[in-house]
């Protein structure tokens, strides 16, 4: 090979933006690749966690209120649980009802539960 890595880097440093653009296109065509920027995989909520908008929410039943039977009926409707399981869930609050749902769905279900007297949190 006639050129070594240092010579290639020196040539790239001296090239104009248009020449570099042509080089990228030629490399893409020659080797069948694309020069797409790598996408970072979303990790845990580290330093940038506060800046990101939350997309998944948890619906937590905080209390049943005075109309426990109506709350149990709505909980059964939302979760698909049987009567016994829904009653246990309502009796042992705070308990999560649904996890990882969209904000719109969480707000809709919260309104439905608050309508029958339950206290609900969206986290």
From Swiss-Prot:
The keyword Ribosomal protein applies. Keywords: Ribonucleoprotein, Ribosomal protein. GO terms for biological process: translation. GO terms for cellular component: cytosolic large ribosomal subunit. Forms part of the ribosomal stalk which helps the ribosome interact with GTP-bound translation factors. Is thus essential for accurate translation. Belongs to the bacterial ribosomal protein bL12 family. Homodimer. Part of the ribosomal stalk of the 50S ribosomal subunit. Forms a multimeric L10(L12)X complex, where L10 forms an elongated spine to which 2 to 4 L12 dimers bind in a sequential fashion. Binds GTP-bound translation factors. This is Large ribosomal subunit protein bL12.
């Amino acid at each position: 090979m006639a050129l070594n890595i240092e010579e290639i880097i020196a040539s790239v440093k001296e090239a104009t933006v248009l020449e570099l653009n042509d080089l990228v296109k030629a490399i893409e065509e020659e080797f069948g690749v694309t020069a797409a920027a790598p996408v970072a995989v979303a990790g845990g909520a580290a330093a940038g966690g506060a800046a990101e908008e939350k997309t998944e929410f948890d619906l937590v039943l905080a209390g049943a209120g005075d109309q426990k039977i109506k709350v149990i009926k709505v909980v059964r409707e939302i979760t698909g649980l049987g009567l016994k399981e829904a009653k246990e869930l309502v009796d042992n609050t705070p308990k999560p009802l649904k996890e990882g749902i969209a904000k719109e769905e969480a707000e809709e279900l919260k309104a439905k539960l608050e309508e029958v007297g339950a206290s609900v949190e969206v986290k």
